[in-house]
Regions:
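A feature for loop-to-transmembrane-helix boundaries and adjacent hydrophobic helices
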Residues: 1-219
Length: 219
């Protein structure tokens, strides 16, 4: 499915396809590629910077061996827990098929942050390394991952904010439909978004830039 996203005040238009390519008949999404790219860059740079924090670079890869699987479960679990009604059948029981269907979307970075802290605490305890030093280094990785990863939200046309008429407002049919279905705009507002007169805050971009600023501050 192609989503057309425009920034009327900036004269920009993007044609976005969530699917990058197909592999063995299965779609490979840009979101996953971008998230994985952010994670790999974070691991690479943190490995380079590790000696500054008194951390052995190999410890980062060892920790990631446990942190990544835990995060894959936690990002979905966090989203499901806080949106449980979306995964209930008509009789009130949980639809485990829908819960386990990652391809339908529904992930929350907060779950990965929580699980990573827990894994890091256990890892540092077992390996007898400083949790605070590792956490200081980990913050750099978090900023890098989020800086890049938020562009996955752009490819999915999600994680946008409230309505606005600012020059950098973001517009699109899928955005207008979401706002109308969620009750954030009425029919007039829906048509205004379609026309480009009204848009939404590109919060994915805001957060990406905040993480870039955060990385400069802690580096």
């Amino acid at each position: 499915m192609i989503n057309i996203v425009t920034f009327p005040g900036l004269g920009l238009e993007f044609s976005l396809n969530r699917v990058a390519f197909h592999l063995f008949g299965r779609p490979i999404f840009w979101y996953g590629i971008i998230i994985a790219s952010g994670m790999l860059l974070a691991v690479y740079l943190c490995s380079r910077w590790a000696p500054r924090f008194g951390i052995v670079p190999d410890h980062i890869l060892d920790m990631m061996f446990f942190a990544v699987p835990a995060a894959l479960v936690a990002v979905r679990a966090y989203y499901v827990i806080f949106n449980l009604d979306l995964y209930r059948r008509g009789d009130g029981s949980l639809d485990w098929g829908a819960i386990l269907r990652y391809s339908d979307g529904g992930l929350a970075i907060y779950g990965a942050i929580i699980s990573s802290v827990i894994v890091l605490l256990i890892f540092c305890k077992v390996r007898k390394v400083s949790f605070l030093s590792f956490a200081d280094l980990g913050v750099h990785g978090l900023f890098i991952g989020q800086l890049i990863g938020r562009w996955g939200n752009f490819m999915n046309v999600e994680a946008f904010g409230s309505t606005t008429t600012l020059p950098w407002r973001m517009c699109g049919t899928s955005i207008a439909e979401h706002l109308l279905q969620s009750g954030y705009v009425d029919q007039a507002g829906y048509e205004a978004v379609l026309s480009g007169a009204l848009g939404v805050h590109p919060t994915f971009f805001y957060e990406s830039m905040w993480n870039l600023a955060g990385l400069f501050l802690v580096y």
